[in-house]
A protein has these predicted regions:
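A short, structured loop/turn motif at beta-sheet edges
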Residues: 19-20, 50-51, 75-80, 97-106
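Hydrophobic pocket/interface hotspot
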Residues: 22, 32, 56-58, 74, ...
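Glycine-rich portal/gate segments that line the openings of hydrophobic small-molecule binding cavities
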Residues: 43-85
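Short, highly charged C-terminal tails/helix-capping segments
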Residues: 142-154
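Generic structural detector for well-ordered beta-strands
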Residues: 10-16, 49, 59, 73, ...
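Beta-strand/loop substructures that line and gate deep hydrophobic ligand-binding cavities in soluble
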Residues: 86-134
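Hydrophobic ligand-binding cavity/cleft-lining segments
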Residues: 1-42, 47
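Intrinsic-disorder/low-complexity, polar/charged segments enriched in Ser/Thr/Lys/Arg/Asp/Glu/Gln
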Residues: 6-12, 19, 43, 55, ...
Length: 154
C-alpha cells in the first residue's frame, strides 16, 4: 500500500451552517467568486461547468497585480456529498467531502500530488497549506456574511 501522506494535503473544517449552503458556496460560480483564493486575492471565473467532465477555468489576481490562471476538470460530483476535480499546472487531484454534523456542516478537503517532490515544491515552497487554510477562512467569513444578511433560508 502506498503511503499517500507525503503527497497529500488535508484540511478539515466545520461550519455553523446547513450543508446545502456550503454546497452552494462550492457549486455556484456567483458564490465561489466571493471566497476562492488566498487572503488578498480576487478571482475571475471564466468558465465553471459544474458537472462531471466540465471545465473550471479561473484567474486568481494576486495583491501585487500578478495573475494566476487556473484550469481544472470536474471528475466526480455527488450532490451534497462529494466534489473531485483535477487541477493542471501544477497537477493535483482535489477531493472535497461534505457531511452534515449536529448544528452545521463539516468538509474534508484533500489535495493529492503526483510525488513527494511535487508536494514539497507546492506545499513547502509555495505555501499551499497556508493558502488552503486562508481559503477556508474566507469561506467561513462569506458563509457568515450570507447568514447575517439573511440571504440564505433553509
Amino acid at each position: 500500500m502506498e503511503n499517500t501522506k507525503q503527497k497529500e494535503l488535508q484540511t478539515t473544517a466545520t461550519f455553523n451552517a446547513p450543508l446545502v449552503l456550503i454546497w452552494e458556496a462550492w457549486s455556484d460560480p456567483e458564490k465561489v467568486v466571493n471566497w476562492w483564493g488566498p487572503t488578498g486575492f480576487s478571482t475571475t471565473i471564466h468558465e465553471m461547468d459544474f458537472r462531471e467532465g466540465g471545465e473550471w477555468n479561473l484567474t486568481l489576481h494576486g495583491p501585487t497585480g500578478t495573475n494566476y490562471p487556473n484550469r481544472s476538470i470536474y471528475k466526480e460530483i455527488i450532490p451534497l456529498k462529494k466534489i473531485v476535480f483535477e487541477h493542471f499546472n501544477p497537477h493535483f487531484i482535489a477531493t472535497i467531502l461534505f457531511e452534515s454534523k449536529e448544528g452545521g456542516t463539516e468538509i474534508q478537503w484533500n489535495m493529492f500530488f503526483d510525488s513527494p517532490e511535487q508536494f514539497d515544491i507546492i506545499v513547502t515552497a509555495h505555501k499551499a497549506d497556508e493558502g488552503q487554510k486562508q481559503n477556508i477562512e474566507r469561506l467561513q467569513n462569506y458563509i457568515q456574511q450570507l447568514l447575517d444578511e439573511g440571504k440564505f433560508q433553509d
